[in-house]
Amino acid sequence: MNEPSRLRALRRAMSSEDIEALLITRLPDVRYLCGFTGSNAALAVTPRKSVLFTDGRYTAQAHEETRAARVRITEPLQTVVGEACALLERSIPKKIRCYYDPAHTTVSALAAMRASLSTGRRRGFFAPLKEPIVSELRMVKDADELDRIAAAALLGNRLFHAILQHLQPGVPEAEIAASLEFFARSMGAEGMSFETIVASGPRSAFPHGRATAHKTPRNGFVTLDFGVILKGYCSDMTRTVCLGKASRSERSAYDAVLEAQQAAVAAVRPGVTSGEVDEAARSVLQKAGLDKYFTHSTGHGVGLEVHEPPRLGREQKQELKPGMVVTIEPGIYMPGRFGIRIEDMVVVTEKGARVLTPVTKALIEL
């Protein structure tokens, strides 16, 4: 991974906004910038220095993983955020402010920040960022990130083919999810990127239907939405298959969702806004009279986290850029009847989009 170049890019972004000190407490951002994967950390960044703060449990791990930042182990009874703030207060000139991301700073971290200011002489020392500059950097993936995401997606593709062999009527959804997760670990995944969704029959109309003891029907749709973590990066894909033969109305609905998904993939290219991609999917479903059943956005970014910016939703203005990785996942959900969702991960290229999950999207009837 290329942490030094990421910190250089961050410093350029800080300079353009006249930011001379930044405190980062969001763990995926810390990992992105310096490589540390522990569960308790803060990263302080100034124009010339970057210091990772963590506690004594992670001494060896921090020194092994961290690149482009000095490691500082906090004293017992001192919070990581509090010690980072105290150092910044001592080392930064009085008129300089330290910025933080208000969207990803917890209440406890904010309390530690305030408590670290021992006197009122630095009132206003901490200030919220106007724009989430680390999140903006993370939206465009570098070559190493793209390789890792592609590898995770490839593993997801293999999992889909493996789990098809276990899909049959009368099997608890939770058993299917457990089998899928077992296969994932057996194939080298570090874990699942989110709780596996297996929703069958009328439950497929739940967009985020958790796998339950409900048994798969003799006839009806089964929605499989899953992802893995590999080398720290996530995958995410959805396919909807049919047990038994689909009815005419089920097939017609499936074809409409597939057409919407393909239209959105075709709309992805540099310069297009995320809202325009959403509209490409939504307009197809509108023509089919199904848009009222499409109750979520068309997609989202994927990387160190399975849900990242940009969001591909109505009226979203984020312009797509080469190197962004997003999902395209329109769906329809008819309560009491069925639901259908089809999801691919795509990377934005110089000329369009490359699909990372090229598993068949033709309706599979088992």
Each predicted region: which residue ranges?
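Active-site neighborhoods and metal-handling regions in enzymes and metal-associated proteins
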Residues: 1-366
